């Protein structure tokens, strides 16, 4: 049965072909995404082509929404650029620094090792806003579990004591309560590290809303074949970076000058921008949902990739584009009827009338989408997302064990 509730994960892959290679990504279904990276099904990333086969090493779940997961993913990928992490990874001695003649610190830019990636993850889980999200870190490899413990032992020497939750699960009821809510009267809030087998994780993972199972996805073993023929329709498709839906012909979209490959719907960037803070306020129940009205026009927006800020008026004037019918489609040799002047005028009036109806329809769709997202945010707060059923928890409690990462204070 399809579920309308999406779970958001950041995953960490390890390559069998290249022992030092790793990859960080985001998905609502990491197991299906792993198959895509390995070329079993369509739409794998180009960067993972040379490292096939890949294995799932770490998976971080429990994010409140897609935006939070994407921001976590970007910070994990670019810790030397992210404002939240760049100073802290220095204090954790994860990376060395240099000083120029102008006394500016420059982080060494090189490929991050697997141990550094794990250290960065542990560092991020102690920082705002992630330390308050009650995230769960699923660890699938013994070597990664050992690496995590080594990092914990290492940071003791520099007098850093992160607060990792390592509960003592007494029985199934405590396990249910802890994984459902992340807290109860016995345990404090914190990041949970769970040692889990990949097959167990795959078995208990619910299918995402867009497919019942992996069997619904067309098999394409040659997905990484460079000679693969791309269809004419797909070659001109533009997808919104935030909602991952196609931008229709005639629709306006925003293209950021800092990241030209990032294109988003205007309605999506409106929710990402000024109203994002208001959504967090609604979720935190600082005031009821019925009293909340998000601004239809944001004052400021930020690039979803690098988080560079832009004023809405500036973006509206300079960066909004319209997706038009590609000129190549007019060169396919299609025969078009020759119209007289009177027929052209009637056709033009008819087309303008249709465009007006389409624009009104898009406006109503944007308003409905906005209202539905707000209702979903409120509904998610009122009713916690249940990852597994009682029967599934009974089995997972026997197959998984929590990793003890308790740091004794000196």
UniProtKB/Swiss-Prot annotation:
GO molecular function terms listed in the Swiss-Prot or TrEMBL record: 5'-flap endonuclease activity
Domain GIY-YIG residues, every copy: 6-89
HAMAP family the UniProt entry points to: Endonuc_su_Slx1
Compartments in which it is found: Nucleus
Any Pfam family the entry gives: GIY-YIG
Family note: Belongs to the SLX1 family.
GO biological process: DNA recombination; DNA repair
Function: Catalytic subunit of a heterodimeric structure-specific endonuclease that resolves DNA secondary structures generated during DNA repair and recombination. Has endonuclease activity towards branched DNA substrates, introducing single-strand cuts in duplex DNA close to junctions with ss-DNA.
Name of this chain's protein: Structure-specific endonuclease subunit SLX1 homolog
Cofactor(s) required for function per UniProt: a divalent metal cation
Keywords for the protein's UniProt record, in alphabetical order: DNA damage, DNA recombination, DNA repair, Endonuclease, Hydrolase, Nuclease, Nucleus
Enzyme Commission code(s) on record: 3.1.-.-
Record note on quaternary structure: Forms a heterodimer with a member of the SLX4 family.
